[in-house]
Regions:
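Class I S-adenosylmethionine-dependent transferase superfamily signal
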Residues: 28, 51, 122
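A short acidic, Gly/Pro-enriched loop at the edge of an enzyme's catalytic core
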Residues: 91-103
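Amphipathic alpha-helical dimerization/coiled-coil segments
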Residues: 1-9
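C-terminal alpha-helical "lid/dimerization" subdomain adjacent to the S-adenosyl-L-methionine
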Residues: 131-193
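A short glycine-rich, Lys/Arg-flanked "PGG" loop and its adjoining helix->strand segment in the class I
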Residues: 116-131
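Class I SAM-dependent methyltransferase SAM/SAH-binding core
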Residues: 38, 44-92
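Conserved alpha-helix/loop element of class I SAM-dependent methyltransferases that forms part
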Residues: 17-36
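A short SAM/SAH-binding and catalytic strip from SAM-dependent methyltransferases
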Residues: 101-114
Length: 198
């Protein structure tokens, strides 16, 4: 008990053997019902493959032919028959209207020239009752991100994301900061969610 008493108040910041966000994610995914998920701006598809472990189907969208080729190859090597990579733009994803349960933008929306258009497309491809999840950087002033990471936008404020979701017609939009980096430039990650009515 002394060991845990000393850890009180810093448990989340201290190394604990076997405790990782990746392990927690695997556990939480097992609680999800089988769904059709669109992973927008999927890149190599690390997250897509994690989701494919429990999803009914994952559609990974990226505008880089090399990323799509690589992701598809790795998915095949790992036996993910329910994971499909498609070459396309997150503003006009090659996905049928009303066909997915969840649209996920994980650190992808800041790469869109027209982020509002990407959110509108997410609404279009979602089934009624489907959800949008946006994980992105909160507004920041680190201009080098444009050159270093090909960011088009320097993150988004909670107000901006809430307004984007509301404008399209998402119900119950919620926005919150979910992570803060300790080292400079101290990026914060913001989560925005909404539900398509119907």
């Amino acid at each position: 008990a002394d060991y845990f008493d000393k850890l009180a108040g810093k448990f989340g910041r201290t190394y604990v053997p076997g405790r990782s966000w990746q392990a927690l994610a695997h556990g939480l995914l097992r609680l999800m019902p089988p769904m059709v998920i669109a992973d927008m701006g999927a890149g190599e598809g690390t997250l897509s493959q994690l989701l494919a472990r429990t999803a009914k189907q994952v559609i990974a969208i990226d505008n880089s032919p090399k990323m799509v080729e690589y992701g598809a190859r790795i998915a095949k090597e790992n036996g993910f028959s329910n994971l499909e990579y498609r070459l396309g733009d997150i503003e006009e994803p090659p996905i049928e209207a009303g066909s997915v349960d969840v649209v996920l933008f994980s650190q992808a929306l800041h790469h869109a020239a027209r982020p509002q258009r990407a959110v509108e497309s997410a609404f279009r491809i979602l089934k009624p009752g489907g959800r949008i999840l946006i994980l992105d950087l909160a507004s920041h002033t680190y201009e080098q991100a444009k050159e270093l990471y090909a960011h088009v936008w320097l993150g988004f404020s909670g107000v901006e994301l809430h307004a984007m979701l509301e404008k399209v017609g998402f119900r119950d939009p919620e926005v919150s900061v979910v992570a803060r980096e300790q080292q400079a430039p101290n990026f914060q990650t913001i989560l925005a969610t909404g539900i398509k009515g119907g």
